[in-house]
Amino acid sequence: MKKQLKFWLVFIGIGSILSCEKEQQKTLDLSQANIVISAQIKSPIQETAASILVEEIKKRTNLQLGWNNNWDSKTTIALALANEKELFGTKVPARDGENTPESKKEGYRIFHQKDGDKNTLWVIAADKRGILYGIGKLLRTAKMENSKITLNPNIDFSESPEYALRGHQFGYRNTANSWDAWTVEQFDQHFREQVLFGANSFENIPFQEADSSPHFKIDPQIMEVELSKICEKYDADYWVWTPAPHDLTIKNAHQDGLAEQEAFYAKCPRLDGVFVPGGDPGENHPSKLMPYLKDLSEILHKYHPNAGIWVSLQGFNKEKVEYFFNYLNSESPDWLKGVVYGPSSPPIELEREMLPKKYLHRFYPDITHTVRCHYPVDNWDQAYALTLGREPINPQPLMYTQLFNRDTKYTDGFITYSDGSHDDLNKVLWSQLGWDSKKNPKDILHEYTQFFFGPKVAEKAAQGIFDLEKNWDGPILENESIKETLSLWKSLEDNNPDLANNWRWQQLIMRAYYDAYIQDRLAYEKRLEAEAYEILDQANALGADKAMSDALEHINKADTELVSQDLKEKVFEYGEKLFQSIGAQTSVDKYQARSAERGAILDFIDYPLNNRWWLEDEFKKIGEYTSEAEKLARLEFIRNYESPGEGSFYDNISSADARHVTSKTDDAIDFLWENNGLSRKRLSTQLFQFTPTLEYRDLDPDSDYLIRVSGYGEALLRANGERLKPAKYEKGFEEFKEFPLTKALIKDGHLKISFDKPDEEHLNWRKQSRVTDVWLIKQQ
């Protein structure tokens, strides 16, 4: 019996030891690691790599890792180049074959090697950039907590980038909604973080006046050189966006432009790309622009021999496009590095097809705006467009993953257009998709939240970002997830006070509160408007003037009996925090934002979400009528504006809740912008399309209908392909065109409405014809 007991005790003991060893293998503890860096990694990247590892780990763990080029420590983080055989006497792990990621440009491999009781985490790269990207992957995947940094053991991960060019624009100018307030140190940290997520290029917009922004901490003429130095520190390409003189036909414009550029080139320690937009701004013909660029290239190469000249075809008409490509085909200039695809360029796939193979094709996608832009938010509720506007905090991982894969394939890479820190998540997403377009955005977001917020909240915060994007999907009043999103972020906010000063954290929480406040306001104000119309329904009994007075008093409760002020106060609280942390300018008056469209989301947080401003103006007009009958008739029309009766239908074009509209615009200029964002027009009039399409089913085939259209200018309407003649044709805003529709055209109860585009190419789009409202009214 004693022998049996002794056997089981020994067995249990051995099992415990094995279990402990197994437990220990679950993580690779780097808390006491020493850093070893190859001498082949030249300065400044050797110092940069060491400082990144030491500083970023210390920020998150309070651990101070050592940098000693020896193997005395039991745990080592070793940085080496793939072509090296040994690192301070230790063999560098190598794989067979020439097609490994770590042998390709910018590629790297992270590999855990265990030798007895010693652990080495290798970062092996093809070049010095690859070293930084390998460090980035290490820091993004490591779990860093107080006094501890761990990684999954036996890691063997490698990758090289799919796209050679992966960058973002950071124009140090007043137009930016935040970083015109940044110091050199803030730019250094931010560029570092972008590099750690895979970026390799940064584009500035030089030649700014010192007094052009009230937020400048440093003269822009100095900052444009400092940004060049930062790029050199991180081995990132430094690009500049520098338009040509507006009109090169003006005397001395050509030479003056060259002289200004030369002075800038001479003082930059690093410069890799010069992007000269063909238009936007400027309207130079390529016959004038190309000689200017040729001369510019000679000056550029005098100071930066390997830098390239790039040009876009923005705003080019057909003749200019043909001239440009004929020039490339006939002259084949070696001084031109490539063409940039930007807004109002020819279609991206056509531009790639026409571009000779010797030239690179760069994408210039707008990831910073939500309306009146390159990539509008799909199915966005008007209430958001009126309040959050064009530059809100806009993490949209799912939308941008789809758009990246749709468009970037025609190019050799990208430098995104950005004008603020509000699109930070989008930048990281694009950088990572530039490495691998098949990456799951869920994995990208998890690395983002783990690196910036820590492993404990990473999963929930990543979900919270997806939820913020979901908040913007479709009609607000039908979106049940908005309050759930707020609940998640409130919980994260309450339980993680240590993140209170983290600007990325502040942005996301602010959006959650803002969205919820808009939802509450919209529900409240829509109810007030519906109740105001019920008062107008009593106009025959009350009298027109009394009914208007009572209705206006009721609908204006939106301004006197406020809702959800606790949510609004939190939004303003975070507006102040963001101004203090990163200089975010969320208000023109309060924080000196450049303009109302430039991120000033606080200034529009209480913009009317019902038609009270419009009703006030309409009631003033009606008050001038001399006939009570006229007043009552107009009030009846207003009351039933969106309710044409049983068997009839109304659609506000481009509204998220329009049921019959089948068309979408591709640039979101369907949200009107006038009077600096404070339009008093009817809300439906502020949404439009130029040539919408609508579709109806199950109409009464035995009934005639009337199609009523509101908008501006022409309306060349077709019903099931047949052009209809109008019985009424008014062209002003909130006036009407009416088209009789006979039952002969809808024998099967199916109707498609379309609009031919009038010949208005000579007009600015703001003056072109558009459709705002469409009624299909059943005739009795």
What are the residue ranges of the model-derived segments?
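Bacterial N-terminal signal peptides that target proteins for export
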Residues: M1-W8
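Glycan-recognition and processing domains
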Residues: W613, D617-D700, N764-Q780
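Acidic, contiguous N-terminal accessory segments
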Residues: K6, I14, C20-K114
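Feature activates predominantly on carbohydrate-active enzymes
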Residues: L28, S43-P44, A49-I52, E56-K58, ...
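Structural motif
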Residues: I37-S43, L79-K85, I124-A126, Y172, ...
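Catalytic-core regions of glycoside hydrolase
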Residues: K143-S147, N200, S212-S228, E232-K233, ...
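Beta-strand-rich ligand-recognition modules
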Residues: L683-D702, S710-Q779
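C-terminal non-catalytic alpha-helical accessory regions
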Residues: S418-N426, K438-F637
